[in-house]
């Protein structure tokens, strides 16, 4: 770090603490905001403060929200019969960006009795008919799916999980064996 520039060094350190930001990028960002574009720097500081103060988890699903209920849970146009279970609010952002799903969500960031009871109450309250699991593929997620299926088998639900396989534009030589195996075993007719 540069001696005599404590504020600059603190800013660099703050940027470097963010995911995927290394020291060189942190220095570039700090320099840009302090020297090249101070107005954007002040705007960024204001936006960060507002986001930290006003964004919280939706009380129903756990998505990012500025209100008790997020826009998704409040939207009357959404299909209220299906519930997609995800691992984090970031997953909701990704699915929403894809515009491939129009139902509700539930963030299952940890598997405990409190979360399971909350999930059950939402299923009963909203008369959910299908649970879609959109979890990272792993042995743990498979066990979680099996556990939830078993726990809620008496609720007359359909259970499904998102398809897995080979991403678009990826050569077979670059695909891991588990994904390749799943893609072959769960292939679809054309």
UniProtKB/Swiss-Prot annotation:
Zn-finger segments (C4-type):
58-73
- Recall the GO molecular function terms of this protein's record: DNA binding; zinc ion binding
Gene3D superfamilies associated with the record: 3.30.60.80, 3.40.1360.10, RecR Domain 1
InterPro entries to which the protein is assigned, alphabetical: DNA_Rcmb_RecR (IPR000093), Rcmb_RecR (IPR023627), Rcmb_RecR_Znf (IPR015967), TOPRIM_dom (IPR006171), TOPRIM_RecR (IPR034137)
Which keywords has UniProt assigned to this entry? DNA damage, DNA recombination, DNA repair, Metal-binding, Zinc, Zinc-finger
Q: Pfam families of this UniProt entry?
A: RecR_HhH, RecR_ZnF, Toprim_4
Q: Which GO terms describe its biological process?
A: DNA recombination; DNA repair
Q: Where is the Toprim domain?
A: 81-167
Known SUPFAM superfamilies for this protein?
A: Recombination protein RecR
What function does this protein fulfil? May play a role in DNA repair. It seems to be involved in an RecBC-independent recombinational process of DNA repair. It may act with RecF and RecO.
Indicate the family of this protein: Belongs to the RecR family.
Protein name, please?
Recombination protein RecR
